[in-house]
């Protein structure tokens, strides 16, 4: 595979990052309540844009030896083949976070080792070339840490719960970020106090293009989803029905913009649910029971998928009244699923889910067709073991 175009950003990223200082943050609020069980959404995920379908997975070896390398793959629109698209020039041991914009994809590098800030990279040609960007702070350890609006306005959720905003994509690339909200301020606001906000997990944009933030709350049955209206944060009104899993505390694991609204993935104890918002009301799915999540993500039209610790995979279409559908047992080593893209795949690709399985530096792509997984592609990634030790 030709990696020439991407390699041109190596020097640019290195120079852009050299001038940054260590990120600083706001101390999280202290609340005298019992913290709910910690559930962290894994960074392994996939998303769809007009350019294609993207997947993030960790490859290599032990994280303790810094031999874990996060990689970005793309299945470009109107094709059924995957390609390696990881921006070069920055250590990615800390993980990658990505968000699609209007004809672009923004990737953020989480800090690792001595790196205390999060370099960015943006592509407008489906990952063939990347432009470096700056964020003088550490991105949160969650797949929803970046959001890009149709106008190019960009949000970043930091590790300490602060939300920063850049007015345009150019401002984000130039490092012109300003604080939008802090965890302390959101927790002290009326909706934050009402739900007992404890932490932030995702950012997005609502149907009115105003920022949305989501997190974890300690009040049973109430989800911490907030909308920004001219600097005043209000509850988005996501409350689960008054029986069943809603009796537990709610954690928002994922949040994304969809046409006319938003979609969210929620954890309530050992139950996982999807929810959709049209700007006025929420629709909540029936629950799926699971002890843990290996990966999760969203697809076109508010669809969503879950890869559970048991190896079971569940998908939901996103339409009102839709229910979770179990996929056949995924192949061994599967770390992430990828939904059908917004465009039509090449003839014979089936238009169904792909399962991306990792073994060391080898990625194997399996495609679901007629109720069974079939191997369709294999990619060997040039992992540089020992380069980050």
Can you say where each PLM-predicted feature lies in the sequence?
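C-terminal motif of bacterial Sec signal peptides marking the signal peptidase cleavage site
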Residues: 20-23
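Bacterial signal peptide processing site
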Residues: 25-27
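Beta-strand-rich domains and repeat architectures in extracellular enzymes and scaffolds
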Residues: 35-72, 91-97
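Repeated scaffold domains used in trafficking and secretory/extracellular systems
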Residues: 39-48, 90-101, 138-150, 188-205, ...
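Entry beta-strands of beta-propeller and related beta-repeat scaffolds
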Residues: 49-57, 102-108, 151-156, 205-214, ...
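Short glycine/acidic-enriched loop and turn motifs that connect beta-strands
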Residues: 59-66, 110-116, 161-163, 216-221, ...
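Conserved Ser/Thr-centered positions that define the repeating blades of beta-propeller domains
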Residues: 75-77, 123-124, 164-170, 226-230, ...
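Beta-propeller fold detector
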Residues: 83-89, 131-136, 175-185, 234-240, ...
